[in-house]
């Protein structure tokens, strides 16, 4: 999956006038941590093509040149490079991975197995920190966190998925609608994440990418009359989403961002991706009365989705800035993001340690697990202390 795959025709379900098929593989999304990166690729056979007006040979649906999604990918990569420059592991931490990269070397893999910066750097660069959003009036973090990534692995998986899904959607629906779908879905994922995961720094574009999947699914429902192999397409999409959400219950994964992004994208798909029904396209140039452009069910879905979407954003933002903890109103919801087992814990409390400096010796105790350690360090920086604390508390 990459640039080569993105050159194939934009396709989804079979249309009712002519058919063309092509096979593509969708890589399961990383989603916010290395746990989901281990997911296997799922293959998806798509078969969508623009159909022509009868007797005229004129394409009803315009094909767009996809430029916005590649720009999003370039922006994400650029932000990651800047983040690694700011991180400057050799100077701030000392214990780095891939030292030959110099200033761009990664944090120790015990601290960040995704090959990326420290959590402190991610926070500085605009990661989603609920305390800073609510008490520090830094609401912009609800948007900025979608452009940051925890590491090379995280970035690679999200960008491959974005290219594969996003380019095809932009070809069919244009940069305005797909750009709005991507950005608003990421924002919706951030809001839900902030309501339920209140003690972690959250970053990643997975919520926005899940929004594209949600839009794909709702687009089939809203444009039901123009496709012939709807059931197969819907089942395939649902399985892809279910697998990725299932991977999201592993520890360290922000599944609430995925759920929020998918739900937002699903509702937005009804609003942004609506198309004229088959009968209108087939009969509009023929004799007799002209049918309505959209069917009644399309108008109903459009209206209901828009109302739910607006109401959801209003309630979510009001709750967030009134410091409402979603877990207090839903005792079981935390299982949607992590299910504890004998193999792992779902403790999401941030690493916190007590330290004592005597000469060149730094003594540290993790308040989460009670582990203690001593280090020979003279005047360690705050970043170095934070890095050691994170490793000790793992």
Swiss-Prot record:
Keyword field contains Plastid: no
InterPro entries for this protein: Peptidase_S54_rhomboid-like, Peptidase_S54_rhomboid_dom, Rhomboid-like_sf
Top EC class for this record: hydrolase
Cellular localisation: Membrane
Gene3D superfamilies referenced in this protein's UniProt entry, alphabetically: Rhomboid-like
Keyword Membrane found: yes
Keywords, alphabetical: Hydrolase, Membrane, Protease, Serine protease, Transmembrane, Transmembrane helix
Biased composition (Polar residues): 39-49
Single GO MF annotation: serine-type endopeptidase activity
UniProt topology in membrane: Multi-pass membrane protein
Entry-linked Pfam families: Rhomboid
Protein family according to the UniProt entry: Belongs to the peptidase S54 family.
Function: Probable rhomboid-type serine protease that catalyzes intramembrane proteolysis.
Protein's name according to its UniProt entry: RHOMBOID-like protein 4
């Amino acid at each position: 999956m990459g640039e080569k795959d993105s050159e194939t025709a934009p396709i989804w379900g079979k249309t009712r006038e002519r058919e063309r098929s092509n096979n593509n593989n969708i890589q399961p999304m990383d989603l916010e941590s290395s746990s989901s990166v281990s997911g296997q690729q799922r293959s998806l056979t798509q078969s969508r093509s623009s159909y022509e007006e009868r007797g005229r040979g004129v394409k009803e649906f315009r094909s767009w040149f996809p430029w916005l999604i590649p720009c999003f990918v370039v922006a994400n990569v650029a932000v990651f490079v800047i983040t690694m420059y700011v991180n400057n592991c050799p100077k701030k931490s000392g214990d780095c991975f891939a030292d030959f990269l110099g200033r761009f070397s990664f944090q120790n893999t015990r601290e960040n197995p995704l090959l990326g910066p420290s959590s402190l750097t991610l926070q500085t660069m605009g990661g989603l920190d609920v305390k800073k959003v609510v008490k520090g009036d830094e609401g912009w973090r609800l948007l900025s966190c979608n452009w940051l990534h925890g590491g090379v692995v995280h970035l690679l998986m999200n960008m491959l998925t974005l290219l594969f899904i996003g380019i095809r959607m932009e070809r069919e629906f244009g940069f305005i609608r797909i750009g709005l779908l991507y950005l608003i879905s990421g924002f919706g994922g951030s809001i839900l994440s902030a309501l339920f995961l209140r003690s972690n720094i959250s970053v990643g574009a997975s919520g926005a990418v899940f929004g594209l999947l949600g839009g794909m699914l709702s687009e089939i429902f809203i444009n039901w009359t123009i496709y012939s192999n709807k059931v197969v397409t819907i089942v395939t999409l649902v399985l892809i989403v279910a697998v990725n959400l299932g991977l999201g219950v592993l520890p360290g994964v922000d599944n609430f961002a995925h759920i929020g992004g998918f739900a937002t994208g699903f509702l937005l798909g009804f609003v942004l991706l609506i198309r004229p029904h088959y009968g209108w396209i087939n009969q509009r140039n023929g004799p007799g009365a002209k049918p309505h452009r959209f069917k009644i069910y399309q108008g109903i879905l459009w209206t209901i989705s828009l109302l739910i979407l607006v109401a959801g954003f209003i309630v979510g933002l009001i709750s967030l800035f009134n410091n409402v903890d979603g877990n207090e109103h839903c005792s079981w919801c935390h299982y949607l993001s992590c299910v504890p087992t004998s193999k792992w814990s779902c403790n999401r409390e941030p690493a916190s340690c007590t330290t004592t400096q005597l000469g060149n010796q730094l003594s540290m105790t993790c308040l989460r697990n009670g582990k203690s350690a001593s280090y020979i360090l003279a005047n360690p920086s705050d970043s170095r202390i934070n890095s050691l604390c994170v490793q000790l508390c793992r």
